[in-house]
A protein has these predicted regions:
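Active-site-adjacent beta->alpha loops and helix N-cap segments on the catalytic face
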Residues: 68-69, 93-106, 122-130, 148-172, ...
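Acidic (Asp/Glu)-rich catalytic clusters
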Residues: 48-51, 73-80, 100-110, 131-139, ...
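Cysteine-cluster motifs in flexible loop/terminal segments that predominantly coordinate metals
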Residues: 1-38
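Catalytic beta/alpha-barrel core
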Residues: 60, 84-95, 116-119, 142-145, ...
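Active-site pocket-lining/capping segments in soluble small-molecule metabolic enzymes
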Residues: 4, 45-50, 63-65, 147, ...
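Conserved, mostly hydrophobic/aromatic
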Residues: 85, 134, 201, 205, ...
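Conserved N-terminal beta1-alpha1 strand-loop-helix module at the mouth
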Residues: 40-84
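Short, acidic/polar
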Residues: 65-78, 124-133, 191-200, 274-283
């Protein structure tokens, strides 16, 4: 990694890989010095047009890995309730369909794709080919991350690549005309340099920042006010203890006070999880200048369809709150329209 520190820095300054201090904490923040040739946002114009009118509603797609049928099943509850789905990495399922192929499967289900690309699994040649394929597939945007170390996921036996890091990947994606977002962890050390770090990624070509959980709406608002690009904070979706355990494992993730307890102590954690996520999402959408929200969480194997239904309930409510309008398209389907239509 050249442009660190990544988001995997613990509150005590430790690296997520092992019991040692992040080496970047004692160094000046690396500055972006590379040039960039941006060909235009391509298919990203649709998202930019929406973002100019109202906050974006994005969600994860909780499909089982390497399962096209699961993608179809989990896409149905989200169709028409989100502006795009984030098809990114998964800590418990490192082996996924390649981003461009997965994007095509999702697009076939009528959803825009915000495709996640990490630097852990491919060298720069393979990454460039993947970005070219995503641009050709017409994805709405790409989310460029360095990627979690494999020691912390479902395939600790895999060798990490990290030929590039997220900042250099951003520049490469921008050259292909892709609309680019990056990740940031506002609560991870060095906290005082996190917005500057986003600034360096913006200089490389990033247009949005998706935020790791960093507390309540006040904490998000404080970070957003100083961030050089529009932000999409995360709305944590918890419906059971396994999902709560996964979110607690994220480095430097800070959930709103009492968030998890309110859900797990309820008689119906699923219903409570939906209610709490909607209320928190609405609070985030009220932050001035917010670009949108990303609803996501941990899902137990086999529970993907139920989790997708819950996500759809949350995103439907947040879409209406954000100013979008929903109308029936079929017996059990919805499509998004502008309020004036």
């Amino acid at each position: 990694m050249t442009y660190g520190p990544c988001g995997g820095v613990g509150a005590d300054g430790s690296c997520e890989v092992g019991d040692f201090r992040c080496t970047f904490l004692d160094l000046p923040l690396p500055r972006w010095t590379g040039g960039r040739e941006i060909r235009g946002p391509g298919a990203g114009h649709e998202l930019l047009d929406l973002a100019a009118r109202r906050p974006l509603i994005v969600s994860m797609l909780p499909a089982a890995p390497l399962d096209a049928r699961s993608i179809t099943e989990c896409a149905a509850p989200l169709r028409g309730t989100v502006d795009a789905v984030l098809a990114g990495d998964a800590a418990t399922s490192r082996v996924q369909f390649p981003p461009a192929y997965r994007a095509r499967l999702i697009q076939d289900e009528g959803l825009r794709v915000w495709a996640g690309v990490n630097c852990r699994d491919r060298n720069r040649v393979a990454l460039e080919a993947e970005l070219a394929a995503l641009a050709h597939a017409g994805v709405a945007a790409v989310h460029c991350v360095t990627g979690d170390h494999p020691l912390g996921g479902g395939r600790p036996d895999a060798q990490p690549v990290f030929d590039l890091d997220s900042t250099r990947l951003v520049a490469l994606a921008a050259e292909y005309g892709l609309l680019v977002s990056v990740a940031e962890s506002p609560a991870a050390p060095p906290v005082e340099l996190r917005t500057e770090r986003v600034g360096e990624k913006a200089r490389a070509g990033a247009s949005f920042a998706m935020l790791q959980y960093c507390g309540g709406a006040a904490e998000v608002a404080a970070f957003a006010a100083d961030c050089p690009v529009p932000v999409l904070p995360g709305v944590p979706m918890i419906v059971d203890r396994e999902g709560a355990r996964l979110l607690r494992s994220f480095a430097a993730a800070v959930l709103p006070e009492g968030f998890t307890e309110t859900i797990l102590d309820a008689a119906d954690p699923l219903a409570a999880g939906i209610d709490v996520a909607v209320r928190h999402g609405r609070e985030l959408l009220e932050i001035p200048g917010i670009a949108g929200v990303v609803v996501a969480g941990g899902v137990a194997p086999g529970a993907e369809p139920t989790f997708a239904e819950a996500l759809g309930e949350v995103t439907r409510a947040l879409m209406l709150h954000a100013g979008g309008a929903l109308r029936p398209r079929g017996p059990d389907e919805w499509i998004l329209t502008r309020p004036s239509e």
